[in-house]
């Protein structure tokens, strides 16, 4: 079973660690603050092909800390999103430690 750890930083964000490896960075107070470069690139692509604030349907393959779904919710409220995340332990820990915002349309599905 994977070990999940949450490491807080001095700015209020949290890095989600799985088996000692950083998986994602979440700032629940500022979901538009993206730390990992690959997430910044994905956000830039979404901005280029579907500018905010209009909602967009998104399917995410992998979720970890749900950083990108949180960003989509913050920048395009009402967007229906499905996250395919096989690690149910990770998902449960993230939901407990880093709750999703109210009125979100993010659905996480376990895909084995």
For the regions a protein language model found, what residue spans apply to each?
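N-terminal auxiliary segments of SAM/dcSAM-dependent transferases
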Residues: 1-20
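Catalytic zinc-binding patch centered on the HExxH motif and its immediate surroundings
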Residues: 23-27
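The AdoMet/dcAdoMet-binding core of the Class I SAM-like
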Residues: 10-11, 29-112
């Amino acid at each position: 079973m994977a070990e999940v750890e949450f490491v807080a930083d001095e700015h209020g964000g949290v890095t989600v660690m799985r088996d000692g490896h950083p998986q994602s960075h979440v700032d629940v107070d500022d979901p538009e603050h993206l730390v990992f470069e690959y997430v910044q690139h994905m956000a830039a692509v979404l901005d280029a092909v579907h500018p905010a604030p209009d909602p967009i349907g998104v399917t995410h393959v992998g979720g970890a800390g749900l950083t990108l779904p949180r960003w989509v919710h913050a920048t395009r409220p009402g967007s229906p999103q499905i996250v395919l995340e096989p690690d149910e332990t990770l998902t449960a820990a993230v939901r407990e430690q880093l709750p999703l915002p109210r009125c979100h349309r993010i659905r996480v599905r376990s895909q084995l």
